[in-house]
Swiss-Prot record:
Assembly notes: Homodimer.
Positions annotated to bind [2Fe-2S] cluster: C50, C123, C195
An example molecular function term from Gene Ontology annotations: dihydroxy-acid dehydratase activity
Keywords of the record: 2Fe-2S, Amino-acid biosynthesis, Branched-chain amino acid biosynthesis, Iron, Iron-sulfur, Lyase, Magnesium, Metal-binding
N6-carboxylysine, modified sites: K125
UniProt function note: Functions in the biosynthesis of branched-chain amino acids. Catalyzes the dehydration of (2R,3R)-2,3-dihydroxy-3-methylpentanoate (2,3-dihydroxy-3-methylvalerate) into 2-oxo-3-methylpentanoate (2-oxo-3-methylvalerate) and of (2R)-2,3-dihydroxy-3-methylbutanoate (2,3-dihydroxyisovalerate) into 2-oxo-3-methylbutanoate (2-oxoisovalerate), the penultimate precursor to L-isoleucine and L-valine, respectively.
Gene for this chain: ilvD
Protein name in the entry: Dihydroxy-acid dehydratase
Recorded superkingdom: Archaea
Cofactors demanded by this protein: [2Fe-2S] cluster; Mg(2+)
Lineage of origin: Archaea, Thermoproteota, Thermoprotei, Sulfolobales, Sulfolobaceae
HAMAP family in the cross-refs: IlvD (MF_00012)
NCBIfam families: ilvD, PRK00911.1
Amino acid sequence: MPAKLNSPSRYHGIYNAPHRAFLRSVGLTDEEIGKPLVAIATAWSEAGPCNFHTLALARVAKEGTKEAGLSPLAFPTMVVNDNIGMGSEGMRYSLVSRDLIADMVEAQFNAHAFDGLVGIGGCDKTTPGILMAMARLNVPSIYIYGGSAEPGYFMGKRLTIEDVHEAIGAYLAKRITENELYEIEKRAHPTLGTCSGLFTANTMGSMSEALGMALPGSASPTATSSRRVMYVKETGKALGSLIENGIKSREILTFEAFENAITTLMAMGGSTNAVLHLLAIAYEAGVKLTLDDFNRISKRTPYIASMKPGGDYVMADLDEVGGVPVVLKKLLDAGLLHGDVLTVTGKTMKQNLEQYKYPNVPHSHIVRDVKNPIKPRGGIVILKGSLAPEGAVIKVAATNVVKFEGKAKVYNSEDDAFKGVQSGEVSEGEVVIIRYEGPKGAPGMPEMLRVTAAIMGAGLNNVALVTDGRFSGATRGPMVGHVAPEAMVGGPIAIVEDGDTIVIDVESERLDLKLSEEEIKNRLKRWSPPSPRYKSGLLAKYASLVSQASMGAVTRPA
């Protein structure tokens, strides 16, 4: 048994007899009470396919931990399904749920004196929420992603949930029929699991591997794959070794590990939401990570993985050629990763990648060599300038636009912007501004997928969008999000007016409002914040505690 465990102080000895009595009530024997007690934290919900199956995976993880000589007890965390909340008040709870999940795992773990932690997640905020808790707790921990859905098909075209959102815009623009929309809806997401493209959920699953917090190859098998079950069981077994050797999460979650994750994010062209989440996980791990680190790494990292929405393939395709380790190995061989970082296997990243069993199949159609990239620069760029002094984010993997200058069309909410696009208010060449949708303003920094999909679906190919809100990982096109400071706290986006000129310049890493400094200052002096949308309840509480997007939108003590 390891030298130092939490559970003996709670469950061993005469004075802990009442605690042991309760463990006996749930079926634990004397022998099991004497073993390390571990938590299986499971983000489970029937409200959507992403986490519908994770309760079953928890049972498999328990089997693995038992084989490793541990005594597991499982508990659920909440889940907010992003796709179901999209375009409604429900989306304001999405990012909120990330920090709630972290808090829930912390509370359960510490309240019951567990010795180690297996985390199981699926939908977008569950992976970062659980990883934040692991970083905060600094205990032996290992993560396993629940897996993505298989892609759908209609009329010979491969579908993801992105196609349903864009089909709405296409229908409203009379480009497809209502029946075609219905058929796309029925076929786009045919199985349990998360969205099949490299949207936020699959991006964060990939990040769990790149950080060293998940077993190599565990992110890519689909939710319905027998290999998914195998990885879950092996994850449970691996926790035993972490506890035995006293390896805690912060020994893995180092600055170098975060550099590896950012490098992988840039190479794969993953979701912009990963910027927020990696900043948040680093904050909980006590690692100083900034937006400048993302740009520094983006400049040196080529974009090499052709994954939807920026490319052609889905997670199941990547799995067939070897999964995330294929990307990691190319980056390591090019000298772009820290190979000496510790991982949950107890081995280094380099050792894991050398020992991994790669399928003997061609993969260059999905993952290119570093010397023959899709684009020479990473898939995400941080912009700063007079419109975003603290930063903003654009996914260049999903657009070929490197410079865009246009007149502003300003909306004070996502709903107003969606109605504007629907009614034909937005014209080619314009920059749609959506503000008061930031962490404090919305609150909850909702995703603008309904608007971006409407723009794309309507065939408006020369329209940009700038917002202090977020974007779905399924978003494509010249879309800039995470503008900081946000409008609600008096960021310059608050004083943009219809007709102002906005300049997006990726090569110069700039996002500017073409006004003099004096005019910007004068407008800010005249500006006053609107009344908060919520004065009580969870969202009001969240708005009072949340930081800006440039800091990961983490909640901190007031």
